[in-house]
């Protein structure tokens, strides 16, 4: 069984993670910081954005894969995953603390709602109620 939605979203996650890493690397290079944050607030914010992404994204992808494997994905699953990914980009930008700071809140809420919603669906699928 080809998990088209899961594969597409995993590819998107890899690109976003790469982008978040590049953003950290840009600050490291410009400030000549090799290890740690060097007390640089922007680097700390960007590192937290990437770490937050890698803390949450595996759960979302596992839930999506499980739902898709169970044959319960349907047309709704890809847009939910895409919304999550957009929220994570907004969070990454918002973590810089600039005019885009609202993106952090948007990304946080999107992440929480996506995880909770997918977890509920997974339980419904697992118990045969969906």
Positions of PLM-derived features:
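Juxtamembrane boundary at the C-terminal end of a transmembrane helix
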Residues: 120-130
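Alpha-helical transmembrane segments
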Residues: 3-19, 68
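Interfacial loop-to-transmembrane junctions
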Residues: 90-117
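Transmembrane alpha-helical segments that form the membrane-embedded catalytic/substrate-channel core
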Residues: 12-29, 85-94
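Mid-chain, well-packed structural core segment of small domains
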Residues: 60-61, 67-97
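Core segments of transmembrane alpha-helices
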Residues: 52-64, 115-116
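Physicochemical signature of membrane-embedded alpha-helices that form the seven-helix bundle of GPCRs
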Residues: 9-12, 80-83, 107-110, 114
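Cytosolic, membrane-interface loops and tails of multi-pass inner-membrane proteins
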Residues: 22-48
């Amino acid at each position: 069984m080809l998990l088209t939605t899961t594969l597409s979203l995993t590819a998107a996650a890899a690109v976003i993670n790469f982008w978040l890493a590049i953003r950290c690397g840009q600050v490291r290079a410009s400030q000549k910081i090799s290890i740690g944050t060097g007390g640089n607030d922007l680097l700390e914010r960007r590192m937290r954005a990437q770490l937050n992404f890698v803390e949450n994204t595996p759960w979302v992808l596992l839930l999506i894969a499980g739902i898709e494997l169970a044959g319960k994905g349907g047309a709704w699953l890809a847009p939910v995953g895409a919304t999550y990914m957009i929220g994570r980009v907004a969070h990454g930008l918002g973590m810089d603390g600039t005019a885009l700071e609202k993106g952090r809140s948007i990304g946080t809420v999107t992440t929480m709602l996506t995880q909770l919603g997918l977890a509920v669906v997974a339980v419904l699928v697992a118990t045969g109620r969906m």
